[in-house]
Amino acid sequence: MEQLKTPQNQKTRPRNMLPKKKGKELKKRPCKVKRKLFGSENIRPNKKIPLASDVDNELEKKRGSMIRKRSETDLCPDPSVTDLLCHESLTVSPKFERDGLSACTEFENFMDTRKIVLSRNEKSVTDLSAHYPVLCNLGIFERIHSPFLFSIHIDTQSFSVVYVPHKESSCSQFCEPEKNMARILGSGSYGMVYDLNNVAIKASDDLESCISSYVSGVVRAKAGAQLTSRECVFKSLLICNSVCLNHKISLSKTYDTDLYKFTDWKLENVENYYSIFCNLAEAVRFLNMVCKINHCDISLANILIHHKEGIILEAVLADYSLAEVHPQYNGKCGILRQFDHRIQIVPKSYNKLCDMFNPGFRPMIAHKIILVEVYAEFDGKGNPVRHCNLDLCALAQVFLLCVIRMLDERGCREAQKYYENRLFTYSNEACTLNPIKYPLEYKDACCKVLAEHLVLFGILFYREVVDMFENLYDFLHASGDLSVRDLLEETYVNDSRDVRRQPIRYRHAQLQRHEIGQILLNDLQQLLSIITISDLEKDPYSVFRV
């Protein structure tokens, strides 16, 4: 144990120091981590996003943008409800096992309303397998081409079940992309992403396939798609339009690039960018307020775009590997898998803040809570508004970096090196730490990320940043953690001294004089200023509206 001292020479609690690795330096790449905080010995960092300096030599390469990260949930649900077997074979049950006309009428009504009401028959409400003659019905799968949500009602209980069809033709065509000479778009701990004739083929694990299938079915149904729809973009959300749960393969469409790699920012296109930002904000609102799903991994790399000459033609939010249903729906959401006739419950949502978001894009309020309690859960209070605003705050961190890139007179590449590299270096430090083994060190890493968020906030909002800093400083002081309080102050003061506003001052003034620019800055400030729980109660529809 080593006794540490604060800059004011105050003694703090002893810390377990990290073991030093000889001959290895930390790779300077921002990353995200999805950890199993309970009952897992297999804790691995996920794919990292390179710093600007790391990709300079690759600018000439045409890269795909389907960059994904692997999902690992914290805990499995109760084993009794994880896999509910549907004992009836789909191949021998084309219709309801009831009397002729009434059964046919009931089936058609089910397909029209996408709802079915069942009697409990003195069974547990979670034992959906008791109703397999109705649920596992070949006629349902024959009517859909992509994952689709159906509501199951048993007495007063309701379940959201996404039917996932299995197409042998797609399986033979896409489930062995290496043999089909598919081009590699990206790779990581989640597996590989390939491009085969503009079809993005993603290989993942069972848990990620489950949550991705569920999100796909819910978004498709809530957006009002037809049962036969094969589209994979709804409300600016990119979802898979086909899933093979046998081989853990999902299909969607490819895009030109992602926001991290996009460098052609131009101030004269600010109206176009604001419109795109509004569409992305609407995607977050739809996902949370309508679908009751937290994205939990909004970042530059997870926003895919088509663009031409500095104009963003289309932008979509992608990658649901870390997505979680709002906790009040735990145990009530699942997927019905045609290929093996099983109902699989969607993994339980624990809402652990240290498991949510890339640390570099994590909302400041989340970092603030982590600095007091590393294992804290996000308290959504069963209110989708809080969950929605949390995702919007992460989206605002993305927009902040985009605006800074647009305003830097030296160009986007210099802006990335000058303003982003330190943030992503701190973020990487947090990614490489296991908060269970090294909770104090993880806190310190998050503290430095939070300080850098304040520095970048002050680049655009230099008058408001003082109040923000003092609010956070006083909060940490009241919590009694003097070492973290002083680390925040030291990092913020030192990093602020190193960063100049000069490269963005002229264009920043131009943006402030532009009508849409004023609205953009105002909306951005409102979201970035959310640093208390009460702030999360604000109307999520009040910002970034076309």
UniProtKB/Swiss-Prot annotation:
<dbReference type="GO" id="GO:0004672">
    <property type="term" value="F:protein kinase activity"/>
</dbReference>
<keyword id="KW-0244">Early protein</keyword>
<dbReference type="InterPro" id="IPR008266">
    <property type="entry name" value="Tyr_kinase_AS"/>
</dbReference>
<feature type="binding site">
    <location>
        <begin position="185"/>
        <end position="193"/>
    </location>
    <ligand>
        <name>ATP</name>
    </ligand>
</feature>
<dbReference type="InterPro" id="IPR011009">
    <property type="entry name" value="Kinase-like_dom_sf"/>
</dbReference>
<keyword id="KW-0418">Kinase</keyword>
<feature type="region of interest" description="Disordered">
    <location>
        <begin position="1"/>
        <end position="29"/>
    </location>
</feature>
<comment type="similarity">
    <text>Belongs to the protein kinase superfamily. Tyr protein kinase family. HCMV ganciclovir subfamily.</text>
</comment>
<keyword id="KW-0547">Nucleotide-binding</keyword>
<comment type="function">
    <text>Phosphorylates the antiviral nucleoside analog ganciclovir.</text>
</comment>
<dbReference type="Pfam" id="PF06734">
    <property type="entry name" value="UL97"/>
</dbReference>
<feature type="compositionally biased region" description="Basic residues">
    <location>
        <begin position="12"/>
        <end position="29"/>
    </location>
</feature>
<feature type="compositionally biased region" description="Polar residues">
    <location>
        <begin position="1"/>
        <end position="11"/>
    </location>
</feature>
<keyword id="KW-0808">Transferase</keyword>
<protein>
    <recommendedName>
        <fullName>Probable ganciclovir kinase</fullName>
        <ecNumber>2.7.1.-</ecNumber>
    </recommendedName>
</protein>
<feature type="active site" description="Proton acceptor">
    <location>
        <position position="297"/>
    </location>
</feature>
<feature type="binding site">
    <location>
        <position position="202"/>
    </location>
    <ligand>
        <name>ATP</name>
    </ligand>
</feature>
<dbReference type="GO" id="GO:0016032">
    <property type="term" value="P:viral process"/>
</dbReference>
<keyword id="KW-0067">ATP-binding</keyword>
<dbReference type="GO" id="GO:0005524">
    <property type="term" value="F:ATP binding"/>
</dbReference>
<dbReference type="InterPro" id="IPR010615">
    <property type="entry name" value="Herpes_UL97"/>
</dbReference>
